[in-house]
């Protein structure tokens, strides 16, 4: 009986890995408009996604208790610093409810992109189909989701920066 239960657990685990692997670097099959939202950052400045139309937007969903999330903060910050002058916006959306949980990590990691407190709660996570943290969504200049990723990413990788360069170089659709 224990063997059957153990086998069942392994099958479920393997299925979850396949689902996550399928989401990793997944491109949207048909253009999907990114749901608009408005949230305040840690300094109280309001950000609306639609305000960034015409720019490539990388949204990173994370939390202070998520070790993998914290590991990717420096490479995400480097991506922002490298491309912000070319039309890239990075928005970090934390699931933490309190600024005090987040601010020390951001200071330590020297994060300079806006970090928003997810006041919309699970509704926003559902709209963006976020199933785990960290998760990253890339939105093109026209406001369409072009990539979704679950799990830690290396934003310094040539594969990712190549995609960002192609998106930045592409003309905005009318």
Model segments located where?
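Structural signature of beta-strand start/N-cap positions in the alpha/beta core
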Residues: 55-57, 89, 114
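Conserved redox-active cysteine motifs that mediate thiol-disulfide chemistry
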Residues: 61-78
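Short pre-active-site segment immediately N-terminal to redox-active cysteine/selenocysteine motifs
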Residues: 55-57, 61-65, 132
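Short, internal strand/loop/helix patches
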Residues: 91, 103-142
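Positively charged n-region of N-terminal signal peptides that target proteins for export
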Residues: 1-6
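Bacterial N-terminal signal peptides
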Residues: 8-20
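N-terminal "domain-start" segment that seeds a small globular fold
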Residues: 23-49
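Thiol-/selenol-based redox modules, centered on thioredoxin-like
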Residues: 138-174
